[in-house]
């Protein structure tokens, strides 16, 4: 390796190396290689018994090689004369090509005269190799001359950056910056050209990233240096200037290394982790488990597969133990890890039983399928865990920054330092989550972009903090405020880049499923905060809901940009507009009204039902968006995305911790109910229609009354909702997935029934009218009876069997019994509500208005309801199947990282 330090330029070149590092050299060399190869292969079968003679074809080929060599010599002479760098080396290389060309001409001519001579063929082959080596060296040398020219320009920029940093006054600073800008632009053009010619993808990415940093940070260095000159007493300005200067030095080194195709240590590490580690390990494991039974050896394969699996489980455990991973998700990941372990042992046992056989048995094939299914389930849980992190962390990403800036504007340095720690933790969390998303992604190009963006965000974090500290020291300084605004803009832009990059490597289906679940959690928290009169909790949680909704709208709208406009995109965008333009404003209005009412002294009454309705509409809006997005998915994709699970489940469908009565052939009982034959589905639909009639009667009855002071109405509504979920289960829909879920729902109904029985008997005890009293007690007995029946019928899975290895779905009788029991209970609840009201009126007439103080039962007519803001979509309309639209557009990291012109205005 030869290092040339002409004018302090670190130029590395090995004159003996013939490694081709650019596409241009390949293109120029290809025609000559083709011609020489064709000539060498002419009559290559060796000596022939045929009459010797001159080969016209060989002579023609020899002439074409000679002409190609002349063309290279002509271009080489021109390059050597015009080149400012490596002139002597180029002249020597041209002469070497000329010399080898003459030898090749002579050897080719002799071979053409006697193409059957192995000696002459050998001479020509050696001459051809020497010629190709000489031409390659000439082209590489010419290429390095271009690199040398780029490095000279890079040195000019490097010196200009140093002068800008060390400027002694503002006038000198302005002069240096004005001189530096055109030099940076010139370097950018040269580096961009070089970038396009580099063969190695890693070098191209390194060049693109370095160019981006250079273009972005030169104007920032000017601003930071200007601030240092105006406020030399503020240490934060100097620290910022030095940080930016260090980044620029790293960018200069990156351009130098990439141009010469010599990767730095950082770049090598970066490139080494270009793919998702966990995703790669899982993919590789799935390939390794398929082995020919004939060559299977337990001693060789068992330790290897177990070691690979434990490595995967270690990575999954790290994700499970991360601070943002929720408890239920952690349990699912642990369960899936145990399931994968068990599946591997079962698979190895089958391999041992099949060892030495030519073909795999059905049992072995089944074990392989089970193994891949378990790894797929683990992947799904890891993806969902990542989406939990993304949904929580990439939410209101500007809040820590705004709080930090506000403290800085007030000149409170102590607060700035406290909020700086919060801001730093927030930045670290974004970077950690981005890396987690990378680990489970198969999108290599997307992973590179995420990691580059995260690296730039990490470098920007201390600069933002220093800018805030500087503003806190000089809060009245206009320059300090402008400096803070500049870094605020840079931070927000970089966070957007990182957010979009993370969105690109994660599944929108997973994102929407997790977001829907998180919004449901937040809606419930909001309602609880309202009932507990927790103003801060209400305001904070409502803000999170607004942030999540805005994020969903942004992600879905961006996703629709990847599709051709049509019915599908119109449907999705219509759902997003409904959420943003109608639902969210109403929710915001209700939140503001609730906060205002609770904050007043004394607290003002408010319509809790209105708030709950507005909150529920937000959840429904998110769910409608998700339904619209999933319209074009195939059944296989829907299965993978867990569509219709509502994410109410608390464990995986294939978890080893799931009891046997919950799973058959790896499917939830609800999924099996969805597979019933059409004839049986029709019977269930008929029963459901009858149930809906009873539900309508209950709706009509409870809608008359204000439930704010009437626990009987509240309990009736709760029982109605749970019964609806149970009937939905029989149709393969709704939040209840397994038999245990239905049993749990039945227990909840029984508990509600017991509470209603207690309230009803209290009313009956005080009722002076014996007839009304007896009616009410009779209806209460019916509720107890039908709750017991419902509890028995809730075990609907009893009729689903696995016979002869095939799934036999015969759950229709149990399903219809369940619906009938729910229908009877619904009717009993309706009659109980009516009888309770009648008994209460008798009690009032006898005892006077004081009876209205009866605990938890106050009969007040409900005010007329407002018209619904959102027209609910029919279920049938959401199930329309259409063909898949165009695939997602490819995001080029080089293009994304090379958009520099936005900074020209600074």
From Swiss-Prot:
Residues 864-894 are annotated as: Disordered. Its main location: cytoplasm. There is a cross-link at residues 57, 797 (Glycyl lysine isopeptide (Lys-Gly) (interchain with G-Cter in SUMO2)). The modification Phosphothreonine is found at residues 634, 645, 658. It is a peripheral membrane protein. PROSITE patterns: VINCULIN_1. Residues 325-394 are annotated as: Interaction with alpha-actinin. Sumoylated. One of its GO terms (molecular function) is gamma-catenin binding. Keywords: Acetylation, Cell adhesion, Cell junction, Cell membrane, Cytoplasm, Cytoskeleton, Isopeptide bond, Membrane, Nucleus, Phosphoprotein, Ubl conjugation. Expressed in cerebellum, heart, liver, small intestine, kidney and placenta (at protein level). Residues 881-891 have a biased composition (Basic residues). One of its GO terms (biological process) is ovarian follicle development. Pfam families: Vinculin. The modification Phosphoserine is found at residues 264, 295, 297, 641, 652, 655, 851. Residues 2-228 are annotated as: Involved in homodimerization. Signal peptide: none annotated. Residues 97-148 are annotated as: Interaction with JUP and CTNNB1. Associates with the cytoplasmic domain of a variety of cadherins. The association of catenins to cadherins produces a complex which is linked to the actin filament network, and which seems to be of primary importance for cadherins cell-adhesion properties. Can associate with both E- and N-cadherins. Originally believed to be a stable component of E-cadherin/catenin adhesion complexes and to mediate the linkage of cadherins to the actin cytoskeleton at adherens junctions. Monomer and homodimer; the monomer preferentially binds to CTNNB1 and the homodimer to actin. Component of an cadherin:catenin adhesion complex composed of at least of CDH26, beta-catenin/CTNNB1, alpha-catenin/CTNNA1 and p120 catenin/CTNND1. Possible component of an E-cadherin/ catenin adhesion complex together with E-cadherin/CDH1 and beta-catenin/CTNNB1 or gamma-catenin/JUP; the complex is located to adherens junctions. The stable association of CTNNA1 is controversial as CTNNA1 was shown not to bind to F-actin when assembled in the complex. This is Catenin alpha-1. It comes from Mus musculus (Mouse).
């Amino acid at each position: 390796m030869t290092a040339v330090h002409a004018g302090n330029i670190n130029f590395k070149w090995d004159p003996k190396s013939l490694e081709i590092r650019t596409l241009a050299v390949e293109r120029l060399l290809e025609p000559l290689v083709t011609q020489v190869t064709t000539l060498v292969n002419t009559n290559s079968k060796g000596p022939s018994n045929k009459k010797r003679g001159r080969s016209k074809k060989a002579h023609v080929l020899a002439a074409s090689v000679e002409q190609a060599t002349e063309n290279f010599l002509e271009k080489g002479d021109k390059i050597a004369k015009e080149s400012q760098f490596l002139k002597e080396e180029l002249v020597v290389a041209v002469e070497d090509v000329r010399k080898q060309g003459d030898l090749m001409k002579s050897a080719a001519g002799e071979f053409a005269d006697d193409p059957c001579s192995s000696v002459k063929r050998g001479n020509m082959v050696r001459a051809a190799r020497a010629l190709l080596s000489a031409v390659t060296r000439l082209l590489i040398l010419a290429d390095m001359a271009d690199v040398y020219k780029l490095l000279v320009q890079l040195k000019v920029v490097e010196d200009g950056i140093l002068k800008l940093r060390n400027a002694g006054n503002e006038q000198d600073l302005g002069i240096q910056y004005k001189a530096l800008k055109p030099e940076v632009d010139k370097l950018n053009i040269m580096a961009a050209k070089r970038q396009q010619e580099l063969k190695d993808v890693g070098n191209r990415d390194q060049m693109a990233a370095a160019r981006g940093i250079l273009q972005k940070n030169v104007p920032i260095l000017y601003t930071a240096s200007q601030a240092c000159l105006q406020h030399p007493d503020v240490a934060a300005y100097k620290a910022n200037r030095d940080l930016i200067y260090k980044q620029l030095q790293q960018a200069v080194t990156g351009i130098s290394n990439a141009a010469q195709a010599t990767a730095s240590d950082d770049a090598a590490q970066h490139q080494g982790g270009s793919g998702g580690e966990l995703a790669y390990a899982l993919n590789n494991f799935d390939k390794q488990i398929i082995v020919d039974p004939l060559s299977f050896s337990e001693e060789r394969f068992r330790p290897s597969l177990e070691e690979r699996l434990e490595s995967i489980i270690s990575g999954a455990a790290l994700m499970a133990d991360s601070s943002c991973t929720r408890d239920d998700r952690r349990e699912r990941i642990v369960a899936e890890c145990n399931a994968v372990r068990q599946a591997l042992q079962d698979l190895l046992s089958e391999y041992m039983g099949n060892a030495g056989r030519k073909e795999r048995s059905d049992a072995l094939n089944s074990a392989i399928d089970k193994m891949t299914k378990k790894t797929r389930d683990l992947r799904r849980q890891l993806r969902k865990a990542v989406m939990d992190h993304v949904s929580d962390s990439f939410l209101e990403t500007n809040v820590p920054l705004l709080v930090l800036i506000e403290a800085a504007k007030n000149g409170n340095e102590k607060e700035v330092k406290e909020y700086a720690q919060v801001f730093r933790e927030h930045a670290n969390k974004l970077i950690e989550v981005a890396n987690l998303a990378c680990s489970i992604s198969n999108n290599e190009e997307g992973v590179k972009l995420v990691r580059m963006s995260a690296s730039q965000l990490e470098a920007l974090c201390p600069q933002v903090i220093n800018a805030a500290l500087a503003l806190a020291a000089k809060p009245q300084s206009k320059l300090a405020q402008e400096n803070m605004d500049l870094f605020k803009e840079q931070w927000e832009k970089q966070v957007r880049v990182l957010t979009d990059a993370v969105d690109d490597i994660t599944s929108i289906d997973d994102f929407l499923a997790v977001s829907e679940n998180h919004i449901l959690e937040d809606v419930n928290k909001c309602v609880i905060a309202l009932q507990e009169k927790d103003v801060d909790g209400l305001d904070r949680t409502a803000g999170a809901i607004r942030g999540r909704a805005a994020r969903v709208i942004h992600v879905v709208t961006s996703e629709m940009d990847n599709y051709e406009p049509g019915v599908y995109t119109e449907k999705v965008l219509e759902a997003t507009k409904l959420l943003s333009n109608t639902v969210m404003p109403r929710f915001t209005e209700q939140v503001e009204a609730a906060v205002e009412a609770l904050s007043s002294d004394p607290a003002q009454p408010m319509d809790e039902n209105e708030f709950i309705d507005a909150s529920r509409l937000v959840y429904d809006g998110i769910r409608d968006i998700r339904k619209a997005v999933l319209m074009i998915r195939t059944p296989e994709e829907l299965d993978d995305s867990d569509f219709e699970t509502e994410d109410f489940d608390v464990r995986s469908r294939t978890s080893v911790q799931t009891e046997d009565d919950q799973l058959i052939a790896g499917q939830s009982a609800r999924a099996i109910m969805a597979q019933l034959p059409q004839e049986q589905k029709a019977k269930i639909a008929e029963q459901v229609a009858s149930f809906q009639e009873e539900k309508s009667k209950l709706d009509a009855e409870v809608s008359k009354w204000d439930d704010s002071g009437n626990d009987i109405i509240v309990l009736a509504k709760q029982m109605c909702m749970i019964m609806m979920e149970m009937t939905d289960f029989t149709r393969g829909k709704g939040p209840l997935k397994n038999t245990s879920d239905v049993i749990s729902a039945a227990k909840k109904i029984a508990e509600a029934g017991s509470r209603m029985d207690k309230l009803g008997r209290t009313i009956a005890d005080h009722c002076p009218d014996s007839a009304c009293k007896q009616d009410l007690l009779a209806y209460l007995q019916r509720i107890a009876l039908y709750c017991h029946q419902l509890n028995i019928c809730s075990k609907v899975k009893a009729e689903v069997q696995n016979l002869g290895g095939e799934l036999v779905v015969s759950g229709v009788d149990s399903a219809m019994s369940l619906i009938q029991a729910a229908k009877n209970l619904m009717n009993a609840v309706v009659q109980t509500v009516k009888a309770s009201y009648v008994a209460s009126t008798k009690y009032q007439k006898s005892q006077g208005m004081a009876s209205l103080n009866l605990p938890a039962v106050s009969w007040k007519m409900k005010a007329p309801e407002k018209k619904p803001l959102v027209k609910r979509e029919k279920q049938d309309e959401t199930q329309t199947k259409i063909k898949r639209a165009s695939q997602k557009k490819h995001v080029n990291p080089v293009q994304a990282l090379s958009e520099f012109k936005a900074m020209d205005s600074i």
